[in-house]
A protein has these predicted regions:
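Sec-dependent N-terminal signal peptides
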Residues: 4-13
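Phosphate-group recognition and catalysis centered on beta-loop-alpha active-site segments
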Residues: 17-258
Length: 258
């Protein structure tokens, strides 16, 4: 009997050790790029986010004219409209990120992320809400996610309401957060969207939206919070996640509060 009790106790201790620390969580905005030798949305920024143990690395995805998903914030890259340009042109060795890396493909980004299996991948689809574009980009996204086996790590965000609604249908087990900032949580919940990720001044104007979202079981993220005073205020308001260019500062504040 004593052996059985000891076995059960050890099992509980191991389970407790394996649990992910409770939130709030820190998301590195476009990866952790504010370090030597890195750049926004680069493979190194992803690796830096993993190195510091960030909850998630946020990144932006565009679709090229020939159907390649690439990681880049703007709709343009070195003056070229990504949606109207083939991948080979964008991947020219003369066109680099600030740290000398080439523009990453989504496949390359996912492959590099496998070294950090505990880190979430906060996927922003860059879209102007064009149905034809999203009809290609969303299925290609899901295919890439499944190909690399990272489905359990994905959280979707987008300014495109239609993309959020469709992601919620395509991958109902994943968190989908709308970025726009103008819609109350209850209305989004009715559409099947499971989170809000609003620019932080929105929550100063509508702090009640945080409680409203939580009552509906929705996730509350906020961007892009870089000053300590804002981080403290938003943590007091009760956000679940902070997206920031200063992830180590946010980590220290959260550890201090806990």
């Amino acid at each position: 009997m004593k052996k059985i009790l000891l076995f059960l106790l050890m099992g509980c201790m191991l389970a407790a050790c394996s649990e992910k620390p409770s939130g709030p969580y820190v998301v590195a905005h476009r990866g952790y790029w504010k370090t030597d030798g890195s750049a926004q949305n680069s493979i190194s920024s992803l690796q830096n986010a993993g190195r510091i143990g960030a909850y998630g690395s946020e990144f932006d995805v565009n679709l090229t004219a020939d159907g390649q998903l690439v990681v880049n914030h703007d709709f343009t890259y070195h003056g070229l409209e990504i949606a109207a340009t083939d991948f080979a042109t964008l991947h020219d060795p003369s066109l680099t990120l600030a740290n000398g890396e080439l523009i990453p493909t989504l496949d390359e980004y996912f492959e590099a992320s496998l070294a950090y299996p505990g880190m979430k991948l906060v996927y922003e689809l860059k879209s102007k809400g064009e149905p034809e574009y999203e009809a290609l980009a969303l299925p290609a996204t899901v295919e890439a996610i499944n190909r690399h086996g990272v489905a359990s790590r994905i959280e979707f965000i987008s300014f495109s309401l239609s993309a959020c609604v469709e992601f919620a249908k395509l991958m109902p087990d994943n968190v989908v957060e709308y970025l726009g900032g103008e819609i109350a949580p209850a209305e989004l919940h009715e559409m099947g969207i499971t989170g809000i990720d609003y620019e932080y001044p929105v929550f100063y104007e509508h702090p009640e939206w945080i409680e409203e979202a939580h009552k509906l079981g929705m996730v509350v993220n906020t961007w892009t919070v870089n000053k300590e005073e804002d981080m403290r205020k938003l943590l007091e308001l009760g956000v679940d996640q902070i997206t920031t260019n200063e992830p180590e500062l946010a980590q220290r504040l959260i550890a201090e509060i806990k």
